[in-house]
């Protein structure tokens, strides 16, 4: 059991290309980076397990990559990518709103937003389960979302878009993630099985 890693973490996508079942969406995100047409706020919506947080992390890393590949992926070699991969990046911050949903939590985040990045162009703030923020926390966050510093990008993720205030929705580019199809799920299971040296019949995977 030593060094055991849960498969969901071991095979979590780390590039746009490896994201399962969201090709149109990841292509749009890559194009936004390539053309330097980045919004200050994004809202990733969809059911659990479709890749919202994973895509947010890949997007955040690629935004700050100093030498993106010709395919629009992060290089994983520059200081910004290395810092992210080693979980020591000061430019990418994550907040789980399910357990950090108070006004004080948001005010602390707003204070961080004011400080420009030391490396790279942007500081990216990923707020997961954003619908869990209290009404007062949403209101405290709204002004920053209305007038963000040029170096700040927010990526909000939610399973319940209908709970987000209209004033927040109107300031975000909204991306609706698809449910992952049976075909894509089976193909990914086959890939994982092959990597693990497991022989699996197609009927078993399906």
Identify what each model region corresponds to.
Residues 1-174, 181-184, 190-194, 202-203:
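P-loop/Walker A NTP-binding region and its immediately flanking N-terminal helices
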């Amino acid at each position: 059991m030593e060094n055991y890693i849960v498969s969901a973490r071991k095979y979590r996508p780390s590039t746009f290309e490896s994201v399962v079942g969201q090709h149109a969406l990841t292509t749009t995100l890559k194009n936004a980076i390539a053309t330097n047409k980045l919004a200050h706020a994004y809202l990733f919506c969809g059911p659990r397990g479709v890749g919202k947080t994973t895509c947010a992390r890949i997007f955040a890393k690629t935004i700050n990559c100093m030498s993106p590949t010709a395919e629009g992926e992060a290089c994983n070699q520059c200081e910004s990518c290395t810092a992210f991969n080693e979980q020591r990046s000061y430019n990418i911050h994550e907040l789980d709103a399910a357990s950090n949903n108070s006004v004080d939590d948001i005010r602390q985040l707003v204070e961080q937003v004011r400080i420009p990045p030391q490396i790279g162009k942007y500081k990216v703030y990923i707020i997961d389960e954003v619908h869990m923020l209290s009404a007062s926390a949403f209101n405290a966050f709204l002004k920053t979302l209305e007038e963000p510093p040029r170096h700040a990008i927010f990526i909000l993720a939610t399973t319940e878009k209908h709970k987000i205030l209209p004033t927040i929705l109107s300031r975000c580019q909204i991306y609706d993630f698809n449910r992952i199809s049976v075909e894509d799920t089976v193909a990914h299971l086959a890939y994982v099985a092959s990597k693990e040296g497991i022989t699996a019949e197609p009927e078993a995977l399906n």
